């Protein structure tokens, strides 16, 4: 029997309707559109496409987007000065840094100039610390989207055993913390985990965030388990696959996100949700 498909496109569409209504209400309260500022260094085509998609999404929901494109040769001081100006600008409600930064630029230095109240990626040390303490403010968008998929599709988390494969500061670790705060028993797996399959076969929920195409095979999956696949791996033929062997896993799992069309569409919408949170919190409304 095939697994239930956790369709991120369908969920994202429902969320867009909800967020558009919230932004309309917010605009009435503050007499303007909430503004997101996106800082991009260089003009990498993939990064540019992503930034344009954020611009289109923002405008479609009634928010405004300002894109600041800095040259590849920008210095650390110039980049930090740009972020400082945006942090101090009362007309900007949230800031998104297009990552990763080019080699030679320090993310830590840039984050030191970003006020946590405007950190739409949820990666500022203060926001990371609040999440670790169980007092989340602005949460990284990708794991927030994963939790939203679990919630909206009514996947039980409390009391379940969950494994997160991947320990990045932006996806793996925050996802593990969110699952822990939802009362799951969580194991974090990584490149040094011995016998990954033995760990995963004990788990009711598997979160794949390793960045390795089709790392997780059907033999590693407990029958009926729920799989959230954050992997976005482009193969030599141009096709995109996740970190899970979807074609085989769909015959074993109870529920699974496809790639593409699973976690990706929800991630971008979570960015707008963070913009609304940031605006309300900063303006005290």
From Swiss-Prot:
The keyword Amino-acid biosynthesis appears for this protein: yes
Binding site for NADP(+): 166-168, 191, 232
UniProt xrefs under InterPro entries: Aminoacid_DH-like_N_sf, NAD(P)-bd_dom_sf, THF_DH/CycHdrlase, THF_DH/CycHdrlase_cat_dom, THF_DH/CycHdrlase_NAD-bd_dom
Pathway note: One-carbon metabolism; tetrahydrofolate interconversion
Molecular function GO labels: methenyltetrahydrofolate cyclohydrolase activity; methylenetetrahydrofolate dehydrogenase (NADP+) activity
Catalytic activity: (6R)-5,10-methylene-5,6,7,8-tetrahydrofolate + NADP(+) = (6R)-5,10-methenyltetrahydrofolate + NADPH; (6R)-5,10-methenyltetrahydrofolate + H2O = (6R)-10-formyltetrahydrofolate + H(+)
Any one of the GO CC terms: cytosol
The EC number(s) this enzyme carries: 1.5.1.5, 3.5.4.9
Gene Ontology process terms (BP): L-histidine biosynthetic process; methionine biosynthetic process; purine nucleotide biosynthetic process; tetrahydrofolate interconversion
Keywords, alphabetical: Amino-acid biosynthesis, Histidine biosynthesis, Hydrolase, Methionine biosynthesis, Multifunctional enzyme, NADP, One-carbon metabolism, Oxidoreductase, Purine biosynthesis
Gene3D superfamilies per record: Leucine Dehydrogenase, chain A, domain 1, NAD(P)-binding Rossmann-like Domain
HAMAP family the UniProt entry points to: THF_DHG_CYH
Function recorded in the entry: Catalyzes the oxidation of 5,10-methylenetetrahydrofolate to 5,10-methenyltetrahydrofolate and then the hydrolysis of 5,10-methenyltetrahydrofolate to 10-formyltetrahydrofolate.
Oligomeric and partner information: Homodimer.
Family: Belongs to the tetrahydrofolate dehydrogenase/cyclohydrolase family.
Protein name (database record): Bifunctional protein FolD
Source species: Chloroflexus aggregans (strain MD-66 / DSM 9485)
Organism taxonomic ancestry: Bacteria, Bacillati, Chloroflexota, Chloroflexia, Chloroflexales
């Amino acid at each position: 029997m095939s697994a239930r498909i956790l369709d991120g496109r369908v969920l994202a569409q429902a969320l867009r309707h909800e967020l558009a209504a919230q932004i309309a209400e917010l605009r009435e309260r503050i007499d303007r559109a909430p503004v997101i500022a996106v800082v991009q260094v260089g003009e990498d085509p993939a990064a540019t496409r992503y930034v344009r998609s954020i611009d289109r999404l923002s405008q479609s929901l009634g928010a405004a987007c300002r894109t600041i494109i800095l040259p590849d040769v920008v210095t650390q001081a110039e980049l930090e000065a740009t972020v400082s100006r945006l942090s101090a600008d009362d007309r900007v409600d949230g800031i998104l840094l297009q990552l990763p930064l080019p080699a030679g630029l320090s993310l830590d230095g840039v984050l030191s100039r970003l006020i946590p109240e405007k950190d739409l990626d949820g990666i500022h040390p203060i926001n990371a610390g609040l999440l670790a303490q169980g007092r989340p403010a602005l949460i990284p968008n990708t794991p927030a989207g994963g939790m939203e998929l679990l919630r909206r599709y009514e996947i039980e988390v409390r009391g379940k055993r969950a494994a997160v494969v991947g320990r990045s500061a932006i996806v793996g670790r925050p996802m593990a913390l969110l699952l822990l705060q939802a009362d799951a028993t969580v194991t974090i797996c990584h490149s040094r985990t011995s016998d990954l399959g033995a760990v995963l076969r004990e788990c009711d929920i598997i979160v794949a965030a390793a960045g390795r195409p089709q790392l997780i095979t059907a033999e590693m999956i407990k029958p009926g388990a729920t799989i959230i696949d954050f992997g976005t791996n482009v193969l030599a033929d141009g096709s995109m696959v996740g970190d899970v062997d979807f074609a085989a896993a769909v015959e074993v799992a109870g529920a699974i996100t496809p790639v593409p069309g699973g976690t990706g569409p929800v991630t971008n919408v979570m960015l707008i949700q963070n913009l609304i949170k940031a605006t309300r919190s900063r303006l005290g409304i």
